[in-house]
């Protein structure tokens, strides 16, 4: 059966093809009466006509398509959906976009490809970039002259909306909590640490808390690698095998922390009796963990919602939104004072 086209809609409504195009693209026209618009819309429904998105993009110079670009930090891995953080973020972003008449495209950037190239080739109306710290990438995105919102991204380029949590404070709160429980040999397990970014800022908070208690970070207890469940398991097995194990671990992401707990348990090390663990995110995993994970809560869904709102808002004045973090106590940290 032939797919209905503009001509079919025009004939059914008794109007010109141009009139149908005006109605579909919501083009202002004083000559179109409410009755005419209703006839066209009724004809569209009766025929089951589906507008051609590419044609609408050409007509309006607008795709109603927003991009969410997520770094593929681990080559060859399905990284972006292995971490519940991204599922929570995307669910909120997609819902907010859809309610406003937009669609969302999710993409990573392949090796040798820039975020700007991805945005340009997809004809995006705006871009949300998660976890980017490359100044040159920021400059290239700025040259596209489309709205950009940086989420958990720390680059020097100005002129963008940005959203983050107080990462340094979160790292400080987590480490201080362990210290206040009487733990003193505290490791930091995280993703790759550069000279900026969430992992670095959380490390700064970790360092600050240690210094307040007269301690210095031990190089051997700084374990950086992938942010994945599998890497967390490996780190748990590694810590279990140390002659002098830490008595507490601050982990920069819940997915890592849950893996860490599994790795420790498989080697006969108990959480929290032998090693206390605190995570960061407060994802669903933290509640499903055994024992339930004490963690730093950040509202990931709010990040996704706010990112889309900033993107579709016509106000281009850059806004910097910093969300607070809170401590969620569960069962993965013991009070060492009780064992003195």
Regions found by a protein language model. Give the residues of each.
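N-terminal helix-turn-helix DNA-binding module of bacterial transcription factors
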Residues: 1-64
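Hinge/beta->alpha junction and helix N-cap segments in small-molecule ligand-binding domains
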Residues: 76-87, 103-114, 163-173, 189-211, ...
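Alpha-helical structural signal in soluble globular domains
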Residues: 43, 92, 96, 201-213, ...
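Periplasmic-binding protein-like
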Residues: 121-130, 187-190, 222, 243-253, ...
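Flexible loop/turn connectors
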Residues: 237-340
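Alpha-helical recognition/docking segments in bacterial nutrient-uptake
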Residues: 1, 61, 65-176, 235-245, ...
């Amino acid at each position: 059966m032939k797919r209905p086209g503009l001509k079919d809609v025009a004939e059914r409504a008794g109007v010109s093809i141009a009139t149908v195009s005006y109605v579909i693209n919501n083009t202002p026209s004083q000559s179109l009466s409410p009755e005419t618009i209703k006839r066209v819309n009724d004809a569209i429904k009766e025929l089951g006509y589906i507008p051609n998105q590419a044609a609408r993009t050409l007509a309006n110079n607008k795709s109603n398509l927003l991009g969410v670009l997520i770094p593929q930090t681990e080559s060859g891995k399905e990284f972006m959906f292995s971490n519940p953080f991204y599922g929570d973020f995307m669910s909120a972003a997609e819902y907010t976009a859809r309610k406003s008449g937009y669609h969302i495209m999710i993409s990573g950037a392949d090796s040798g490809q820039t975020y700007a190239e991805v945005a340009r080739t997809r004809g995006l109306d705006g871009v949300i970039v998660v976890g980017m710290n490359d100044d040159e990438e920021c400059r290239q995105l700025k040259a596209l002259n489309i709205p950009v919102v940086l989420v958990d991204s720390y680059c020097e380029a100005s002129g963008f909306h940005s959203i983050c949590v107080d990462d340094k404070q979160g790292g400080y709160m987590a480490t201080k909590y362990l210290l206040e429980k009487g733990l003193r040999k505290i490791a930091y397990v995280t993703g790759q640490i550069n000279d900026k970014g969430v992992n670095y800022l959380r490390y700064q908070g970790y360092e600050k808390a240690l210094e307040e208690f007269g301690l210095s970070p031990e190089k051997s207890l700084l374990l950086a690698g992938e942010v994945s469940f599998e890497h967390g398991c490996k780190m748990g097995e590694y810590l279990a095998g140390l002659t002098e194990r830490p008595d507490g671990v601050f982990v920069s992401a819940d997915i890592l922390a849950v893996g860490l707990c599994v790795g420790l348990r498989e080697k006969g090390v108990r959480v929290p009796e032998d090693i206390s663990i605190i995570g960061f995110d407060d994802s669903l995993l933290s509640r499903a963990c055994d024992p339930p994970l004490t963690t730093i809560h950040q509202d990931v869904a709010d990040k996704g919602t706010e990112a889309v709102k900033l993107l579709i808002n016509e106000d281009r004045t850059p806004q910097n939104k910093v969300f607070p973090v809170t401590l969620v106590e569960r069962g993965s940290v013991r009070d060492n004072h009780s064992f003195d």
